């Protein structure tokens, strides 16, 4: 079957068509992404109203382009999947209403997809990874370790108690005067810097809880930058390198605990005669090469296979939404046209909050 996917949760407008036969033989027929970076760069961050208006202006064109590249007519589509949360509500409304309109016009089912579930299942699309696996989701709005037991079955182990990792990258880059988007700019600057020059904290390192924290690290960077201002290019590079080293050390420590938790919960998954368990990284920050290298080394130390989707599927895209929607549709799951988009929508929505586990993230 063929699914049309629509993604409008933040500052990328995207449409895609996939062909789904089963989990191990699905193909991306088209995957169109239009970035709004130029719209938001003058403001140093995403402006929600500008983002929503940009989605309105371009989405219809992208849907047509996705269908054309997939050599597929709308009447041949078996279902229409759209990101329905979490995210910026204005953008979500654009995508959801467009998907509902197409569903009404064609009589094809509408499938509301959790944006986080799209990221969580991308590795199944790209690498045919087997359930269960451990997911590290790192983006501008989320930093979570999640046990993926199966489609629709997720167990959050840890989350950020303050800022998401992508947000920390962007705000640190802005503090250093680096261009928007800040994450890639900071990573590039760090290549030229001395990571040992600026002593920075590793928040929560050594603690048994599985949560993350990055606000204190941001504050330490601000204090260091203020102490040596005005900043030279070398200063900026050294601070960027020191920040990135602190981040990778912190993430390594947190994921180390999550891998131990996984091994305790699934001891038989280490039976090498079957297959190695997998550590999957997803989300926009997963494009950071220093983070990838650190996680790959850590995974191998624990006997895990390390899986990172292609860079084009780490950032927001509609192929992952179409694939998640296809898996739901294959299980007979569709959504009512009365469903409303949600700015907050945790993957483990039915889980009982645990004391000391922190809040559920800025968008979850």
From Swiss-Prot:
Fe cation binds at residues 115, 119, 316. GO terms for cellular component: cytoplasm. One of its GO terms (biological process) is tRNA threonylcarbamoyladenosine modification. It is an enzyme of class 2 (transferase). Substrate binds at residues 137-141, 170, 183, 288. One of its GO terms (molecular function) is iron ion binding. Pfam families: TsaD. Keywords: Acyltransferase, Cytoplasm, Iron, Metal-binding, Transferase, tRNA processing. Its EC number is 2.3.1.234. It is found in: Cytoplasm. Disulfide bonds: none annotated. Binds 1 Fe(2+) ion per subunit. Required for the formation of a threonylcarbamoyl group on adenosine at position 37 (t(6)A37) in tRNAs that read codons beginning with adenine. Is involved in the transfer of the threonylcarbamoyl moiety of threonylcarbamoyl-AMP (TC-AMP) to the N6 group of A37, together with TsaE and TsaB. TsaD likely plays a direct catalytic role in this reaction. HAMAP family: TsaD (MF_01445). Belongs to the KAE1 / TsaD family. This is tRNA N6-adenosine threonylcarbamoyltransferase. The lineage of its organism: Bacteria, Pseudomonadati, Pseudomonadota, Alphaproteobacteria, Hyphomicrobiales. The gene is tsaD.
């Amino acid at each position: 079957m063929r699914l049309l996917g629509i993604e409008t949760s933040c500052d990328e407008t995207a449409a895609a068509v996939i062909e789904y036969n089963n989990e191990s033989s699905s193909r991306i027929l088209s995957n169109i992404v239009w970035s709004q970076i130029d719209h938001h760069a003058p403001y140093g961050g995403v402006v929600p109203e500008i983002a929503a208006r940009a989605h309105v202006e371009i989405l219809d064109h992208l849907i047509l382009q996705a269908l054309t590249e997939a050599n597929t007519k709308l009447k041949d589509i078996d279902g229409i999947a759209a990101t329905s949360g979490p995210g910026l509500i204005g953008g979500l409304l654009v995508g959801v209403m467009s998907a509902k309109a197409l569903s009404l016009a064609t009589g094809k089912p509408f499938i509301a997809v959790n944006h986080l579930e799209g990221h969580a299942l991308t590795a199944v699309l790209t690498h045919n990874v087997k359930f269960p696996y451990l997911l590290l989701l790192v983006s501008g709005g989320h930093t979570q370790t999640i046990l993926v037991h199966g489609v629709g079955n997720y167990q959050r182990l840890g989350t950020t108690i303050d800022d998401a990792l992508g947000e920390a990258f962007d705000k640190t880059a802005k503090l250093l005067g680096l261009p928007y988007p800040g994450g890639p700019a900071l990573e590039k600057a760090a290549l030229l810097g001395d990571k040992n020059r600026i002593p920075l904290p590793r928040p929560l390192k050594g603690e048994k809880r599985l949560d993350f924290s990055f606000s204190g690290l941001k504050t330490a960077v601000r204090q260091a930058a203020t102490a040596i201002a005005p900043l030279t290019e070398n200063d900026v590079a050294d601070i960027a390198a020191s920040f990135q080293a602190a981040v990778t050390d912190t993430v390594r420590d947190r994921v180390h605990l999550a891998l131990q938790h996984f091994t305790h919960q699934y001891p038989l998954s280490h039976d090498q005669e079957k297959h190695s368990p997998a550590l999957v990284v997803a989300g926009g920050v997963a494009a950071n090469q220093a983070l990838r290298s650190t996680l790959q080394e850590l995974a191998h130390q624990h006997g895990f296979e390390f899986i990172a989707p292609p860079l084009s599927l780490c950032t927001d895209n509609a192929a992952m939404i179409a694939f998640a929607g296809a898996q739901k549709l294959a299980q007979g799951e569709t959504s009512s046209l009365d469903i409303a988009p949600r700015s907050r929508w945790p993957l483990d929505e039915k889980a009982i909050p645990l004391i000391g586990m922190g809040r559920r993230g800025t968008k979850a």
